[in-house]
Amino acid sequence: MGRKVHPIGFRLGIIKDWSAKWHASDKNFAECLTEDLKLRKAISKKYVDAAISQVDIERQSNKVTVSVRTARPGIVIGRGGQRVDEMRHFLEDLIGKKVQLNIVEISQAELDAFLVARSVAEQIERRVAYRRAMKQAIFRSMQAGAKGIKICASGRLGGVEIARREVMHEGRVPLHTLRADIDYGCTRAHTALGDVGIKVWVYRGDILPEAKEKSESEVTEMAAVMADAPAAVVTETKVADIAAKPKRVVKKAEAEIPAEEKPKRVVKKAENITKEEE
């Protein structure tokens, strides 16, 4: 299952978040979806060399917030924010709504799966040997702090007539573990002999739920409650301890109990044994 399903979609709502956050009625849903596709396509065409990894879209009443995640924010922003203003006006004319454009910088491009896939694809387009490009990408990602990485290239690798598929990996990539922070990206390298598909999985570690730390006041309150516990609770715990003990210890404990407090069956057994001895 983990090998077939999309790694990001598999973890949505657990450790991953949606790239589009909005709600629309049945009538407006198709319109909003086509607007999202237009926005993403326009941004990717406008900034081809800006190393854009992801575009997040949020919608309010008459306002659309677009967050662009990029490893080269200077190319997107331009001198004095000139290119950002141009892009915002272009997007507003495209969809006919007010657009707020946010630029988010990616600190480590080697840990972003889509950017790693793009770097491999660009090298293949420049006629670099695909094995060399894949090995360099794996080395850089592991040096940047990745726990594991897997790269898959498929197509007419090396210009051969029959298309094939080659996979390289290093470290571990636990696809079935939902708490594992696995980034996934895919792209195409356009060559003279045909397209080469590149897929990249990057394992960046586990995302664990935050443990609730008890304050000192809570600890003192619990101690006070335990100190003031009634005697009935204590006796119940003793009975539970006896039930959890092995059989021999339980029989020994029953023998120590006085005859008046023993149940009727135990008393009858004791009387039968005394009669047989006599």
Swiss-Prot record:
Q: Which CDD domains match?
A: KH-II_30S_S3
Q: Which SUPFAM superfamilies match?
A: Prokaryotic type KH domain (KH-domain type II), Ribosomal protein S3 C-terminal domain
Determine if Ribosomal protein is one of this entry's keywords.
yes
What ranges does the record give for the region Disordered, renumbered to this chain? Answer: 255-278
Alphabetized UniProt keyword annotations: Ribonucleoprotein, Ribosomal protein, RNA-binding, rRNA-binding
Q: Which GO terms describe its cellular component?
A: cytosolic small ribosomal subunit
* Family annotation (NCBIfam families): rpsC_bact
Give the UniProt family note: Belongs to the universal ribosomal protein uS3 family.
Tell me what this protein is called.
Small ribosomal subunit protein uS3
Q: Which organism is it from?
A: Dehalococcoides mccartyi (strain CBDB1)
Q: Which gene encodes it?
A: rpsC
